[in-house]
Amino acid sequence: MERESFQSRLGFLLVSAGCAIGIGNVWRFPYVVGQSGGGLFVLLYLIFLITMGLPVLTMELAVGRASKKSAVLGYKALEKRGSYWHLHGYVAILGCYMLMMYYTTVAGWMVSYFFKFVTGTFETGMDTESCSLEFFHMLSNPKEMGLWMFVVVIAGFIVCSRSLQNGLERISKVMMSSLLVLIIVLAIHSLTLSGAAEGLQFYLIPNLSNIQNIGIGKVIVSAMNQAFFTLSLGVAAMEIFGSYMGREHTLASEGLRICALDTFVAITSGLIIFPACFSFGVEVNAGPSLIFVTLPNVFVNMPAAYRLHNPVFPRFRDNKPS
């Protein structure tokens, strides 16, 4: 059976970048920045991304393209006789399963929030305390979280079952394009909020006083971890995408494009979150709850978004008890 390939180079780039872009950029990056002192962490993160993340990403793509096989079989095809590099393939697969245990859970939180927004749970004028209570109410309801996690898993199975071109590539083009437009619009809006200047100063200007209680060593390790985490390195994901690459483009150029797109989304996410934190009084070191408290504030206090929301979902709004 002939191995399926991507329909276009853009499809490969968006699917590969989509693997890297996601919860690690939109959810994890802002809260780790907040817990790690802001600007200095961002600077170290970019340094590690260029000096360590990009080279490892390129090497993983190289393993995939050279073998044209999945993780374990790829190592077996390339390793010298008597060596045991294929064992890393099994470790990578185990890592993927462990990663999905909480990736699907957090993705479920996000889907839950989407439906709460369109059904009117989040209303214009809600304050930070109300948004925080909504998040912790969700955490106290395991059945709700389990339901949305199940929805995410089933959706993933459906997409993957429709083959590479008709499933993963097609939906990645739509979702990635939508994500890029959305985060740019939200970033522009956040930059117009009162308090945006203080948020940008915390986010983009290194300040040693911000890390006095954290420790420079912890900030360095966190930045290094994020550089590897954000590119999905070490779990054979990029090796699998590399196995679908042709030889008409260089590994370094494709790796650079993936890394650049991933970094753009991460940095832009910070431009959304931190100005909003200082505007709405959200603690920047709030941890995993950061975007689930900040983004509802951004959306419900964004008149244009609210006007779009009402006509699209009038039935939900009308059925909401007063």
Question: Can you name each region flagged by the protein language model?
Answer:
Residues 2-6, 169, 173-322:
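Membrane-embedded translocation segments of transport machinery
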Residues 3-4, 32-36, 66-91, 104-165, ...:
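Inter-helical loop and helix-membrane interface segments of multi-pass membrane transporters/permeases
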Residues 11, 38-46, 83-102, 169-179, ...:
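Alpha-helical transmembrane segments and their helix-start/interface "positive-inside/aromatic belt" motifs
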Residues 11-48, 198, 236-242, 253-256, ...:
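Transmembrane helix-boundary motif of multi-pass solute transporters/channels
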Residues 45-54, 93-118, 148-162, 177-190, ...:
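Hydrophobic core segments of alpha-helical transmembrane domains in multi-pass membrane transport
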